[in-house]
Amino acid sequence: MRKRLVSTAVALAAVGALAVPGAALADSGTASDSGTGRPPAVQVLTDGSRAGTAVVSGQNEPGTRLRIDGVRTASAHTLDVDYQVQETGYWCGPAATRIALSARVAPPSQSALAAQLGTTEAGTDHISQVTGVLNANLGTGWYETKEMPNDPPSQAQKDLLWNDVVLDIDNNYPLVTNIVAPPGNQPPGYPSDQTIYHYFSVIGYDDANRTVLIADPASFGGNQIYWLSFDQLATLIPPKGYAA
């Protein structure tokens, strides 16, 4: 079990479906290396790690898989994960959970995780459901549910979030976050006229740029893997929470 930074939080009443089911997704299909059945590999620091840097974009077919190669530098640390675009408009929770699990084990399918999470067409209700499924599949008690009820978050909540990002990534545990992205405060490519309720995974950080690497299963605007400022991440999670 991890060293606890705070006590385990209670469940959040957070709906994690896309605002418009299927809006970010096109026809079904899965990318893979020619003749091998393995997903293409992606290098995450080729264009740097400043906020807004897109690592992968343009692959938005449901089920598309990419192999994200982790790196470790003096300031940055990212993890090896098996990324996959969510297969339905309301499976962001299962897809983000699958990405997180893939850092440590061969993950179940999105459909299997949707069943474990109790995901419906209304989405995945509570971040605590994600926490429980992560721990159950890994046979661990590492993951805890952390609430961020204040919007904007308090400095103590932001400090805890950054500490969780660094601690978890350094121990090979991606975070799963439940976010609310209103117009005017959205990651790249999100529908600018809608408030998006969503789950995505945090799979790395760069301490020098104070950025985090996001694996976003929705593929809004064709953006899959991108660097986001930590400060923006901290404003997207309230009033929901995250599993770390």
Describe every region a protein language model picked out.
Residues G22, D27-G29, D33-A51, Q59-R65, ...:
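Conserved active-site-adjacent core of cysteine acyl-enzyme catalytic domains
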